[in-house]
């Protein structure tokens, strides 16, 4: 198939990062160019990101936890009027507080669905209920779990999909965003062995390089990696 020539030359992506436990906020502009001198289109894409929630879903001013209800409202206000948006999480989400553990993460999954999360990767604590339950929680949350470096014994991906691709159209021009996720292989040693029995946690850096190249080859203009790692220097 003949690859279509890009019609736009500038993309602006605003990244809002929420530290749901600490209540930290930030906005980061990111630009990409195709080298053309005309036909510029600016896409206003807003991304809401959380990580290490550890089932702290209730607002707690004393411990500086904003809670899922407040997060949902802030995210809705922030993304209103944008050309497109994504809500992403980097794991350690479904486990850590009685409100979650008593129902094996279902309460958190339902709140994630209500907030409108699009995708997440996994942290070691997300495997605490076992691998099958983690898949179930992804379904309850209606969120794509992206940890493509985690494989079954036959080499196929454990989760249903390795990537999320979102297309945003404006003024007849399309921006294609690809999202993938990686989880630290060391996670296999950070949970009960039976929770991850039969799974192969492959090298995160090697997988990330391959998947980023794949998404670019598929025409993605922006590639986002979600990672949960104990070694940020080698994954960043």
Question: Could you say what each language-model-derived stretch is?
Answer:
Residues 8-30:
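Sec-dependent N-terminal signal peptides of Gram-positive bacterial secreted proteins and lipoproteins
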Residues 5, 29-36:
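N-terminal targeting leaders that route proteins to membranes or the secretory/organellar pathways
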Residues 1-7:
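N-terminal secretory signal peptides that target proteins for export/translocation
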Residues 33-236:
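Acidic, metal/ion-coordinating pockets
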């Amino acid at each position: 198939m003949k690859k279509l020539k890009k019609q736009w030359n500038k993309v602006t992506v605003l990244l809002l990062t929420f530290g749901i436990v600490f209540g930290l906020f930030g906005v980061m502009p990111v630009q990409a160019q195709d080298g053309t001198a005309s036909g510029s289109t600016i896409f206003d894409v807003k991304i809401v990101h959380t990580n290490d929630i550890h089932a702290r879903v209730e607002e707690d001013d004393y411990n500086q936890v904003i809670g899922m209800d407040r997060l949902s409202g802030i995210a809705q206000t922030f993304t209103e009027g944008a050309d497109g948006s994504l809500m992403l999480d980097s794991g350690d989400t479904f486990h850590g507080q009685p409100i979650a553990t008593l129902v094996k993460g279902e309460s958190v999954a339902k709140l994630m669905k209500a907030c409108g999360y699009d995708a997440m990767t996994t942290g070691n604590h997300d495997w605490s209920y076992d691998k099958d339950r983690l898949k179930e929680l992804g379904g309850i949350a209606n969120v794509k779990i992206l940890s493509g470096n985690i494989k079954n014994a036959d080499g196929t991906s454990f989760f249903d999909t390795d990537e999320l691709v979102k297309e945003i159209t404006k003024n007849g021009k399309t921006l294609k965003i690809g999202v993938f996720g990686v989880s630290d292989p060391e996670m296999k040693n950070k949970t009960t062995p039976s929770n991850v029995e039969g799974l192969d946690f492959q090298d995160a850096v090697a997988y990330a390089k391959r998947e980023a190249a794949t998404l670019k080859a598929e025409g993605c203009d922006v590639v986002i990696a979600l990672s949960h790692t104990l070694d940020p220097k080698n994954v960043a």
